[in-house]
Amino acid sequence: MKRHLLSAGDLSRDDAELVLRTAAELRELADRPIKKLPALRGRTVVNLFFEDSTRTRISFEAAAKRLSADVINFAAKGSSLSKGESLKDTALTLEAMGADAVVVRHGASGAPHRLAHSGWVRSSVVNAGDGTHEHPTQALLDAFTMWRHLGQGKEQSLDGRRIAIVGDVLHSRVARSNALLLKTLGAEVTLVAPPTLLPVGIDTWPVETSYDLDAVLPKADAVMMLRVQRERMSGGFFPTAREYSRRYGLDGRRMATLQDHTIVMHPGPMVRGMEITADVADSDRSVIVEQVTNGVAVRMAVLYLLLGGSEPAVSTSSTNEAEE
């Protein structure tokens, strides 16, 4: 893998499949009494979050700790950032602390790229979400979840699998990263949204688009629902929440039209009753909770591979060492 993970588009198929295979090894730790490995002992991982986050920050923290890394959580609120300190000065502070990896979430698209290529830090940089641009580790954990449920053949290939991503594509960094990564892995992606929630330039994405959810659902192998990000909206993108749910929400009636093997996904946080009803979110088809579990394994794999992992991630000797 490259030194940084900034975009899902930076990953070759070999890179992506290496992450998925490594995550599969590390996923087994979730079922063990002792969940730690010594792989990153002595390394320091900094979680630098300029935006609020629950799942992603906790997931990266758990991932680093399970690899025995030292973890520093650095939130904008309550730090010098809230007093006007620049990204550069914050980066220089992290460099002085000896950070080996910086996991950054920022409201400005391109901030992780700036941090990685500015020369301010020598550490690996992982994009944990930048504005409406990208969220590559979310795409990796989504692909890993699909890989476990829908993978075909010895290599568990996603070639030809049809994935529907439904909702607020315009403001979704998850949709963009998934579109790029799933194309790399051979899947066919259809974005379903009202015209007002599709970005300018969508015709350049490696996807198909549709305004008709009912026409897309029966053909899909996986359906990913997206939250309407009202905090990023300044105008009216649809008439009412009720009208949006009627046309683009996944409810029990629509779930009944899915193929028997089709899974239902959501990157979170969910708004139950808006884009997805409670009965669908809690159904046997839903893998939403599993996505969270898989997220830790995938982020462990990313940190392990970026920080120099070349041997198998899990071995008997390393497990025994962690238990001592």
Swiss-Prot record:
It is an enzyme of class 2 (transferase). Pfam families: OTCace, OTCace_N. Its EC number is 2.1.3.2. InterPro entries: Asp/Orn_carbamoyltranf_P-bd, Asp/Orn_carbamoylTrfase, Asp/Orn_carbamoylTrfase_sf, Asp_carbamoyltransf, Asp_carbamoyltransf_Asp/Orn-bd. Signal peptide: none annotated. The keyword Transferase applies. L-aspartate binds at K83, R173, R227. Keywords: Pyrimidine biosynthesis, Transferase. Carbamoyl phosphate binds at R55, T56, R105, H135, Q138, G268, P269. It catalyses: carbamoyl phosphate + L-aspartate = N-carbamoyl-L-aspartate + phosphate + H(+). GO terms for biological process: 'de novo' pyrimidine nucleobase biosynthetic process; 'de novo' UMP biosynthetic process; amino acid metabolic process. One of its GO terms (molecular function) is amino acid binding. Pathway: Pyrimidine metabolism; UMP biosynthesis via de novo pathway; (S)-dihydroorotate from bicarbonate: step 2/3. One of its GO terms (cellular component) is cytosol. The keyword Transferase applies. Belongs to the aspartate/ornithine carbamoyltransferase superfamily. ATCase family. Catalyzes the condensation of carbamoyl phosphate and aspartate to form carbamoyl aspartate and inorganic phosphate, the committed step in the de novo pyrimidine nucleotide biosynthesis pathway. NCBIfam families: asp_carb_tr, PRK00856.1. Heterododecamer (2C3:3R2) of six catalytic PyrB chains organized as two trimers (C3), and six regulatory PyrI chains organized as three dimers (R2). This is Aspartate carbamoyltransferase catalytic subunit. It comes from Nocardioides sp. (strain ATCC BAA-499 / JS614).
